[in-house]
Amino acid sequence: MTASAIAAAPRPGFLARRHRSYYLFVAPALVVVGAVIIFPWLFTVWMSAFDWKIGSVAHFVGFDNYTGLAKNQRFLEAILHTFYFTALAVVVPLFLGLVAALIFHREFPFRGVLRGIFTMPMMATPVAVALVWTMMFHPQQGVLNYLLSLVGLPPSLWVYSPTWVIPSLVLVEIWHWTPLVMLIVLGGLAALPTEPYESARLDGATEWQLFRYITLPLIAPFLIVAAVIRTIDALKAFDTIYVISQGGPGTASETINIYLYLQAFAFYNVGNASAVVVVFFVVILALALLLLYVRQRAQWTG
């Protein structure tokens, strides 16, 4: 190394001061994250170890709240309702969003206008959507039963039936969030190269073979991203369910979020509600990590 290179090299003390300045710039954001996310989370974990109802003295019970949840039939049913709702609210919009994206990816008259109309539902707030669909689900005056009568089908109780309440709520989710999946997949389709399609067509590949062996593998990462977003959103769904059914009839549509709300703000059982939050967080985190792992595997194999 020449003398000029040695003289031009930064001194260790200067580098240390420069690195410390980086931390100073990041420090305000870290303080906000700690105050808004980390501290409330740690406080929730701490509260879950107490038998604490608002207005009474808290008693330390350790893991009793968690063992109580494992034996609570209503909580276990809420978990099943949550997974049932989530499975339908993820799979169906993914399929319909993929089909819609494939349609709108092609050139046809008024494509831009129709695509804009198709994306309008996702712009509405969940509460507004829920209020509109509540009127549509009405057994006597709702428009859905009127449409069924036009084609000669018997009326349905929709959200007033324990059997059909969750599929009816999923229908709202499908209408509301399928456009989001379509936009994500459209972004993937727009980025696809044209060379593989041209080569495959020269070899005599059919449209189904083009989709099966070229399009689907290439847009798989985008579908997984859409699945992650929809899974987290469906697991967290509260406002739509609460406005339309309040968890009823009975507890037929009571998901973990509805159960949590009732424990915290109806029964004021803060300790039990905190334990539900911790369990639910672990469930969401595990599913998100699983889907992200599948996405990474899809990229590796691709």
Where are these regions (language model features)?
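A structural signal for multi-pass alpha-helical bundles of membrane permease subunits
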Residues: 21-302
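Short, Lys/Arg-rich, polar N-terminal cytosolic tail immediately upstream
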Residues: 1-17
